[in-house]
Amino acid sequence: KELSSKRKNCSEEFCRRVKQELAFLNMPGIEFVVELERVPLYSMGCDRMQFLVSANRGEPAKPMSKIASGGELSRIMLGVKTVLSGSNLGKTMIFDEIDTGISGSAAQKVGLKLKEAAANRQVLCVTHSAQIAALGNHHFLIKKEVREGRTFTGVYPLDFEGRKRELARMISGVKVTDLTLKSAEEMLALAGFSNESS
């Protein structure tokens, strides 16, 4: 019962902080609630917890797993992990394709939030977003290759020129142009990286 009481007391502040993070991540009107349901005592206490969300004003909050889109789910989990990161839950945060369903300013803000998190711990992020990749301290290209009828996955660290070229490819798709290379170089400069700093 003491654990249950502490969970209840902490949940309001936790929700307030998660909503604050989500507002920064372009989700200002989201409703985020921790639902604690009383269950028979088991190894984790006497509560079952789930996150309820409503991304649309006027709609009731429902289980996150049932209503959040890919982009919403990615940003919600980033918000939750950001709030929990202060509780010393681990030295590494991993995000796989956190850019799903987002673009533009939302991707930029996700990248900034990841960079902020990386100040205190290791953050690994798989992304297809140039805005997010440009903000990373290190950039690796992950590439599948078929050799002798078998598929291999290679991981290649990129220097400044490699980053610029890969960001340009991420921006333009197949054909890299002088304009996309210039855009990629500008993205890296805005993130604080230059050819001299690599």
Residues covered by each model-derived region:
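Conserved D-loop-proximal element of ABC-family nucleotide-binding domains
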Residues: 87-88, 100-108
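Charged, surface-exposed helical/loop "interaction arms" that form contiguous linear patches used
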Residues: 1-40
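C-terminal lobe/lid and adjacent interdomain/linker elements of RecA-like ASCE P-loop ATPase modules
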Residues: 105-198
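Walker B catalytic acidic pair
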Residues: 96-97
